[in-house]
Amino acid sequence: MEKLQNRILQEGHALSETVLKVDSFLNHQVDPDLMYEIGTYFKNYFKEHKITKIFTIESSGIAPAVMTAMQMNLPMVILKKQASKILNGDVYQTTVHSFTKGLDYELTLSKKYINKEDNILIIDDFLANGEAALGAARLVQESGAKVAGMGIVIEKSFQPGRKMLEEKGYDVYSLARIAKLEKGLIEFVK
């Protein structure tokens, strides 16, 4: 997606060889027009996949996921990173390691919001090592539902996430694929 790549080049900051800061339009301040366009790309790519629900992981995936859900006229479910007293234990849970934060968390899904007939599209802001996406997929599979695909806003193609997900048979669609990061340099997959 050329518009997204341009925003990354204009406003993104490669803080290291593995960390890209895009907080001015994606995960701190959000550009709703860009998110709407991102939703359009995901809708167009996944329109034949018979999606029943959009899933995302709190919190940075919420903006692109809600725009995708709006455009597909589907409900969106937010997978929680922390246990909540209001979920009453009737949940699916799996442990996920966060690359960005360097810690483990319990990804949680209320059983109330998924059934075995569901065909789930997982939307996330970043794909690096694939841990978050795999965790979300485990929750979907534990319920008996199916993962129809994964929509990623920004993929770090130099990390193993895509390869791992594709080896497990997932349809991964990324809007911006980064080939290389260096302090002050961002290169896209050609």
Swiss-Prot record:
Q: Where does 5-phospho-alpha-D-ribose 1-diphosphate bind?
A: 128-132
Chief location category: cytoplasm
Record GO terms (molecular function)? xanthine phosphoribosyltransferase activity
Any single GO BP term: purine ribonucleoside salvage
* Task performed by this protein: Converts the preformed base xanthine, a product of nucleic acid breakdown, to xanthosine 5'-monophosphate (XMP), so it can be reused for RNA or DNA synthesis.
User: What binding partners and quaternary form does the record give?
Assistant: Homodimer.
The protein in question is named: Xanthine phosphoribosyltransferase 1
> What species does this protein belong to?
Clostridium botulinum (strain Langeland / NCTC 10281 / Type F)
Q: Which gene encodes it?
A: xpt1
